[in-house]
Amino acid sequence: IDLDFTVDCDRESMLSIRQEVNNEILRYMESDGYHLAPGSKTPHTLDSWVFHYTNAAGNNDGIKIEINYSDRCHIQPAIETHVSIPFLSDVKVRSLSPVELFATKINALIGRSAARDIYDVYNMVKHQLFVSDEEKTLLRKATVFYLTVGSSRKDNATPTEYTDFPQIDKIRFPQIRSQLLPVLRRSEHFDFEKAKTEVKDFLSKLLVLTESEKEYVREFN
């Protein structure tokens, strides 16, 4: 479970509310029989908990909850999505707008290139989620924003040209086999090499920065 704290407030207010959130989540999980694992951690801007429990099959299992407190303000307003689960009542889930959500995924793919990142971005391309010029412009601008403020690049310098994607090229099939395939449906086929090719082609066309965007990146660097 990956959450963002989205209250626009100063650090002192955030820390106060953060403690309330901590207490509420820990109390709820413990009352439902989940046990906090020793590996849980709470660094400066992140709460990361791992809870152990016994699943319906009687096996030991775990659930991870992470709350990010550094990205409190977003580009676009959050949206509410209705989620239908067959054996539960319908629920509303608050999430980032699709454009902003996939901008963060593209940033993660370029920076760290986890197996799930290429899967998510490939499905965005495959299903043509953003087809109009306006949508693609918004996606590019949001991506450029997160490439600067949320970059995981080791050299901390955001490029202004994107003609190749070395981090994506470093992904190997053993990563896909061990990290991605176990969580996909058995009937789902994921063509890894095709996904890499199509994603890199899409990104090379998307990330053609305007002069003003290049100037923004240079000033930020």
Predicted features along the sequence, with ranges:
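Structured mid-to-C-terminal alpha-helical surface segments
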Residues: 3, 7-221
